[in-house]
Regions:
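A short, N-terminal "cap"/entry segment at the start of jelly-roll beta-barrel domains
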Residues: 1-37
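Conserved short histidine dyad/triad with adjacent acidic residue
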Residues: 26, 41-55
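Short, conserved beta-strand element in jelly-roll/cupin
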Residues: 44, 57-70
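Short beta-strand His + acidic residue motifs that chelate non-heme Fe in jelly-roll/DSBH
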Residues: 51-53, 71-72, 88, 94-99
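Structural motif
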Residues: 68-70, 77, 93
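Short acidic-glycine-tyrosine-enriched beta hairpin
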Residues: 76-89
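Conserved small/polar residues in nucleotide/adenosyl-binding loops
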Residues: 100-108
């Protein structure tokens, strides 16, 4: 059987937050799986960094793993706190921005 997930340990308990690091002034991404049915990607945002407004062909499920993020969907802003999730529907303009993280690198 071929491995469907990549860049992440299998058969091991893990914390998603520890699977990606913050880098000052950057949005960092790490793809875990991608195919015609689903794409799972971890993102880390330096404070104030964002993915600007765009639309996508599929729904996007976002979970905040650390800090507070601002999600904009159809011009409406939502604050997402650690542990909270939101679905950004396909075909609707949306953006993601980090407002605050508890990571010490955030204060550099």
């Amino acid at each position: 059987m071929s491995k469907k997930m990549k860049n992440i340990a299998q058969s091991e308990v893990l914390t998603l937050r520890e699977q990606i690091s913050y880098q000052e002034g950057q949005v960092v991404s790490k793809t875990l799986t991608q195919n015609q049915a689903v794409s799972i990607t971890l993102f880390s945002f330096a404070k104030g960094e964002e993915i600007s407004t765009h639309e996508s062909g599929g729904d996007a499920f976002v979970t905040c793993l650390d800090g507070i993020g601002k999600i904009t969907i159809d011009g409406v802003e939502y604050l997402l706190h650690e542990g909270e999730s939101i679905v950004m529907p396909a075909g609707h303009p949306h953006a993601v921005c980090l407002l605050y993280t508890s990571d010490a690198a955030d204060d550099k």
